Structures are given as C-alpha cells and as structure tokens.
Amino acid sequence: MKVQSETQGLSGSDYPSAVQRIALTLVICTFHREEFVLRNLSGLEEAGVLGDHIEVLVIDNSSGESLSAKLAGMAHVRVIPQGNLGGAGGFTRGIYEAMKAACGTGSTEACEPYVLLMDDDIEFDPEVVRRTLDLLANGGEKLCIAGQLYNIHPPHDLFEAGATFGERKPFDWKPYLKPTCCSASLKAGQNEIDYGGWWYFCFPLKAVGQVGLPLPIFIRGDDVDYGRRWVDAGYRIISPDGIGVRHETFDARYTTWIYYYETRNALICLATSYKFRGWGMAVIWKHLEYNIGKDLGRFDYGRAAVKLEGIRDFLRGAESLDECEARHREITALYAAHSLQNVPDDEATRVMIDLERPPRFSLAGRLKSIALKALRPLSCIWASEKHVALHGKVFTSKHLPFNTRSVLFCHTPSGKKYFFRHSADQEKRFLKELSQMRRQWADGFGTAEKAWQEAVPRLTSFDHWEQIFASLDASQKGN
C-alpha cells in the first residue's frame, strides 16, 4: 500500500497543544545491536526530546557492560543489563522498573505517566515522540498508541497500522491498513485493532496494575496478547498518521526455529486473550495439521519439528515457560539438527521458478498433477525426479513440480540460500509423530486450555516477574 511517510503531511497544528503534562518512559529492549541503540538515542538527544519527564530505559538482554559504558555520559538514559529473556522479558523489565520508579518518587501526582516500548533496530524521526506526547495529553485516559510500521527499504510503503489476530482463521495475523488522521482516530468509537507491535507501542503506566504485565513467553505473540488485554480492559488502540517508524518487515528474513514460539504462543493466545474468537479444538487442530503438512511438503523437517514441540509445550501448560534460556537453546539446536547446512552450488542446473511470477498451469496440466499424486507411489517410479531453485520472499510448495526431490530456496530480501531435500524416512517419522500428537491433542486440549486460563493472572503479576528478575540477577552476580 503506497501512502505518505511516517511523518509527512502533518504539521504541528494537526496535533493539539498539550493540556496535561505527560511523563514518558521510553523502554528499548536490545540484544547485540549497540549501533542501532546509540544512533537512535543520539538522535533523540540532539533533537532535545529527552528531559526531566522523558527518560529512557535500555534493557540489554546480552547482559554485557559495553553498552552501559558507552551510554554512561548520556543524561536521562539508564541501561539495565540482564540475561536473555527475549523481547517479552526485556520489555517487561522496562515496565517493571518504570513502575518501581514512579512509586518511589511519587512523580505520578504531577504528571500522567506513560510507557513507550520501542524496538532497538528501528529508524524514526524524533518528532513522532513529540506528537505522541501531544496526542496523549488530549486523547483521554483510556488510550494506547500503536506506531505505524513502514518498510525500512525504499519506497518505505506502509506495512502495518495496528493489527488483528484470529479474525478469519485461528492462525491469522492481519495487519490493519486503514490509517486515519489524528482527529478521526480520537473520535472513532469502535476499537478495530487488537494489538500494536512493540516496535512502537505506548500505554498509561497507572493502568498496568489493572491490565497486568506481559506474559513471559520470550518472543512472538507477547505483543499480540498484551494489546488484546488492554482492549478488554476498556482501552482503545489507535494508529494515526504522523506517528510511525521504519523497520524491516516480516518477510525480510526466512523464519526457522522461531516457529516454535509462534505456534506455542498463538495457542496460548487462542486459549486465553483470544478465546472470544470462538475457535474450537477441532478447527485449531485442522489448521495445525495442515500447516505441518505443508512443511513436510517442502522438506523443511526442522520447521515441522519445532512446531510439534510448540504444540507439546502448550499441552504441558505453564511449566513449559520455566528455564526459558535453556529451552531456547534446545529449540535452536532441534531446528539445526534437522536442517541441511551445506548449500549445493548447482543452482544453474535446477528448474528455476520465480515465486514473484509463478508459472501458470493449464487445465490439462492440473489434471495430470492430480492423477500423478493419486497414483503415488507408483507414479514416482517412472516420473523423472525434479530439482528446483525457488526465488522469492516466502517459501511455498504450491508451485513445486511433481516428484520434486530437492529445493534450493533463494530468499530474495536477504540474499540468503537454504537447501531442502526429500527424505522418505523423515517424512514417515513425522507423519507418525503427527498422528500421535493428534491423539494427545484430543485428550489434552481441554485441560491445557483451562490450565492456561487459570495461570495467566499469576504469570502476569508483579510478584511473578519480580521473582524472575531476582533469580536472573542473582545468577548473573554468581557468574
């Protein structure tokens, strides 16, 4: 969608002058991306945005001292090193520290305190922070702001302006692409946005006691759940023109082990904050089985393996969230064990398919493909084996020729190449595991769903997160 840039087209007069004073804590969660953090904070400092009522908390999940040393001389900036708790743990640490600071100083009496969550690797104009402050000062107390997301690469098209989840089908992350001006956003009555991405998400600190802290689910889905809980508490999420950032879009990388978190956390959301969507056990399983079947069809056995682990951990309940760093290492190792590390240098000899301009099949060709698949495995004996090179943003098996035996996927946004080869043994093993999981799902879904619903108040409580941070800090000091 081609629209104006994240700041273009709105003058200061489009945003009303502040009525009440706002105290803003910017929380940046980072992991080995010092250059991005230094660039963005320098921009805020040079623009004169930071001050007594606008401060920054940088949560460094790499637990090192380098970033702290580099930012030691910057006023109104505090760095908190900690172990890797993912984006969920990093951003929650920032909210937790902001709550402690507000309670300790009593500054909430003079200003309305807000928290602004920001990714470490975004690009933005400091003016968007000023506009956010003006909007908060005039928009009422029951308001959250989701910054619009623009592609960091030219021509910087709009990618998302808030989003919904589970609306059309269970696993459905739908970007909202109806940007509105500031005044229209404030006047709108019905909330059409479920959540805002944590590249830029702002909310009132005082209401965290009512809404709770985010779920400790490491990455992927933490913002999906948290945004919906704000909506359920009576808050509106708006994403007006003029408040946006530039960031890599989700198709800029080929996703591997992260599908463990996407699967597990989506199931947690469907069982708790998005239970109202009404997706039942059978429908959810149908989509899970279909998606894993697609992974097997493109020979990505690593992705199938981590998705099955995600389902298994959902059925285990909240105890699966314990020892998240150790579990993260296990999941990345699991994907690596099923991936092919050596990419062959034979692209020129392969059947080339451009996924941006996929081949069109005639009716006769489609009928032939259906017949060949129906006659398996007999048809595989006489049909020649195919070795394919796919070029595109998203790896799909939809356009693979019959009897494809290996795929070299060239991910055009990143320039990286991934190799996948058919394995009859792996396919048989995962189909058997999928069949076993189907029975476990039928037996355990109801119990797991209820257990997650009962666990959410504890998992999102101040006390629970305080225990997590205390344990993590103690282990760091011990090392």
Language-model features: locations:
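Terminal low-complexity segments of carbohydrate-biosynthetic enzymes
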Residues: 1, 264-479
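Acidic donor-binding segment of Leloir-type glycosyltransferases
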Residues: 43-80
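Donor nucleotide-sugar recognition loop
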Residues: 198-200, 209-228, 234-240, 257
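Conserved donor nucleotide-binding strand/loop of the catalytic core
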Residues: 72-89, 97, 105
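N-proximal low-complexity "stem/linker" segments adjacent to membrane-targeting elements
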Residues: 1-42, 477-479
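A recurrent flexible, glycine/aromatic-enriched loop bordering the glycosyltransferase active site
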Residues: 176-200
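Short beta-strand-to-loop acidic/aromatic patch adjacent to the donor-nucleotide binding site
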Residues: 109-123
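Conserved donor NDP-sugar-binding/catalytic core segment of glycosyltransferases
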Residues: 123, 127-170
